[in-house]
Amino acid sequence: MKHLLTLTDLTKNEISNILEVATQMRRIVAANYKKGPQLIGNVVAGIFPSPNLSSTAMQLATTYLSGTPCSVFGINDELGQCHTFDSMGVNTLVINCANDNLAKSFAGKSRCGVINGGSSQYDPIGVLADLMALNARLDGLQNLNVLAVGNRDVNKINELIHCLQLYGSNLIWFLPPDDFVTTRKGIVLDKAETAFAGADAVIDLGLAAFSEAEKYYGSVGGISEAFMDKARIRCPLLGSRYVVDNVGIKEYTHNIVSSRETCYVSVLMAVLYLMHKD
């Protein structure tokens, strides 16, 4: 694997291989002594708009594999910084930038490996982390109906649709009928009761600015517990730790947010290892 730009370019075998290696890497993350020798002598650089999950995971993943991390934040000339890192001889570059074309165009002529750490249309590491967390909780990714709710982190949608279809599963997206701004992709339902009914897992994408939470979640404070009750028993929830009942906001027992954060680091470790190995 030379680059990882989008999961829509990968086959089922390639995705399964990353998840399998990530499962092994998770043992390092869970261990008291978090060190593996896989990236000794390697430099992993990152370009990020500000400190975030992607930048933190890059630092941890590289350190856990005995590599050397190097990050910059808030750079105006991202492409120029990419070329600077490449000329410095870094082994891998993680790019977290809204511009979808940046990572792709740079990867076409770079000497270093390139990982898309999140852009306006794609989030390969984040989606793999979602899949890994769901795989662990649901004992596989086959024959699932996964429900996405919200309209903020829509850069996950295309890759989730692609990956779940490879495993014979479906992504269903709930959007209220009066959301005329969000571009609809895949299977979209506009009735919450129908969308949540029988869902095997729920992913909260968050809400864009000026969106009315009650129209998406059934309540102002987050996803309504009444909606979650329509899903399968012990339905896992990603993207949020909380639901809202008739009393107020409470932690949802079956949320897997913490597991997903661990999976995010593990997946990035797996990708770094596979790129170095090849």
Model features per residue range: what roles?
Residues 1-51:
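Positively charged, low-complexity intrinsically disordered leader regions
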Residues 33-135, 233, 244-247:
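Phosphate/diphosphate ligand-binding glycine-rich loop within oxidoreductases
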Residues 48-56, 136-205:
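Glycine-rich phosphate/diphosphate-binding loop of Rossmann-like nucleotide-binding domains
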Residues 112-118, 171-172, 253-259:
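Short hydrophobic/aromatic-enriched beta-strand-loop microsegments
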Residues 123-129, 182-184, 266-270:
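Short, charged, surface-exposed secondary-structure boundary motifs
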Residues 183-254:
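Rossmann-like adenosine-cofactor binding region
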Residues 239-278:
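Adenosine-phosphate binding glycine-rich loop
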